[in-house]
């Protein structure tokens, strides 16, 4: 199954021991407990295009506003992990580590590309792992219950400025469950809420394709809680990916590709590979096929679509089949069985948060690639 660049392979780099330097960059959990902090793996920041505004916003929130909880949302392939890895590089690549913004920078994957979809560390495993790292392996006889472990972790987050990252949060959320946690993983909700509401020196960044339940309420209650919805690359930044791969295109050809794929970096890279492999690097030959969704692009969209509720799927179907913007009253008339305006409004908000629909003065629409994916369901 295709994994987006949010799950890219990590790059090994030397660990700085805490007794000699002030910043520790810790190995991602995959998802076993890390026994010590003497070596580490960090997500690799490869060639990076654009995202200047997003990086500036994140730096403002973290360094100036001292936000305690940040969620980065976006469709698969948008480069959420790459964005945060680039951000973290600014905190860890300084030659003068004593001046680093954080003493600890710790990244945890709640699911890795090599593991099954439903395999994720329990909140007890994650909390115990973090406490061992922050205590220099000195913490013993730790409590077993999540609320007690959270209280223990908060002591360290209050004493020391740490940057924590939880990646792939959607892997512990229910499919079609409106942001509800899978049974046995509800403790992550308590952890997120506590970090967002408590007073401390640290910051937790959550990376996910969809938000957990009640996050929007938490964001509205606390000024230290922020949400960044990652959209596609700007046209000029996406174009740089094609130019770096030696593909020549006219402005009209590039505009078609950008409109079809919404600036999704991973999908653009998949298209580049196909153009080289099947069409000798000629973009016009690829466009002449009139096919937007195929192979790994189909798999990527299918992963996202299959997580939706039945009503969310119905809304996407209605918009895709109509192929023109629709307002809420028009959507209400098309949905069978009928639903209330309140339920539809909540569904539209959920889809908008996940960047699966777009809205403007003309109404609600879906992107071209998602439209083709949906219509292909009726042809198969």
What are the roles of these predicted feature ranges?
Residues 44-48, 56-63, 67-177:
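Post-nucleotide-binding-loop coupling segment downstream of the phosphate-binding loop, primarily
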Residues 86, 90, 270, 318:
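Active-site signature of alpha/beta-hydrolase-fold catalytic machinery across serine-
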Residues 258, 265-315, 351, 365, ...:
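Loop-to-helix "switch" segment enriched in basic
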Residues 87, 91, 216, 336-337, ...:
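A structural signal for repeat-array scaffolds
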Residues 74, 83-84, 173, 177-191, ...:
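Amphipathic alpha-helical scaffolds
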Residues 105, 353-354:
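Alpha-helix C-caps/helix-loop-beta hinges
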Residues 4-60:
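Conserved adenine-nucleotide phosphate-binding loops and their immediately adjacent elements
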């Amino acid at each position: 199954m295709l994994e987006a660049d949010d799950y890219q392979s990590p790059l090994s780099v030397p660990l700085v021991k805490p007794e000699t330097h002030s910043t520790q960059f810790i190995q991602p959990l995959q998802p076993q407990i890390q026994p010590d902090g003497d070596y580490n793996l960090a997500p690799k920041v490869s060639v990076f295009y654009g995202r200047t505004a997003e990086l500036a916003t994140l730096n403002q929130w973290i360094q100036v506003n001292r936000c305690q909880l940040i969620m980065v949302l976006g469709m698969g392939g948008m480069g959420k992990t790459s964005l945060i890895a680039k951000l973290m590089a600014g905190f860890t690549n300084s030659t003068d580590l004593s001046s680093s913004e954080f003493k600890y920078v710790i990244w945890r994957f709640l699911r890795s590309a090599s593991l099954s979809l439903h395999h994720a560390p329990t909140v007890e495993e994650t909390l115990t792992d973090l406490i061992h790292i922050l205590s220099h392996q000195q913490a013993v006889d730790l409590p077993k219950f999540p609320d007690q472990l959270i209280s223990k972790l908060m002591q360290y987050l209050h004493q020391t400025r740490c940057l924590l990252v939880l990646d792939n949060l959607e892997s512990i959320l229910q499919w079609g469950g409106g942001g509800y946690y899978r049974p046995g993983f509800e403790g992550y909700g308590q952890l997120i809420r506590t970090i967002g509401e408590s007073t401390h020196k640290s910051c937790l960044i959550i990376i996910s394709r969809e938000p957990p339940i009640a996050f929007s309420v938490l964001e509205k209650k606390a000024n230290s809680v922020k949400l960044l919805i990652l959209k596609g690359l700007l046209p000029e930044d996406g174009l740089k990916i094609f130019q770096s791969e030696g593909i020549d295109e006219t402005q009209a050809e590039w505009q078609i590709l950008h409109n079809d794929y919404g600036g999704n970096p991973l999908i653009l890279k998949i298209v580049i590979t196909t153009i080289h492999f099947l069409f000798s690097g000629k973009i016009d030959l690829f466009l002449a096929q009139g096919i937007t969704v195929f192979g790994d692009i189909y798999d990527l969209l299918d992963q996202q679509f299959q997580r939706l509720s039945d009503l969310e799927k119905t809304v996407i179907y209605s918009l895709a089949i109509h192929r023109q913007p629709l307002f809420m009253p028009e959507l209400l008339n098309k949905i069978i069985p009928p639903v209330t305006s309140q339920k539809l409004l909540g569904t539209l908000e959920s889809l908008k948060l996940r960047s699966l629909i777009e809205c403007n003065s003309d109404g609600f629409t879906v992107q071209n690639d998602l439209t083709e994916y949906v219509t292909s369901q009726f042809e198969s």
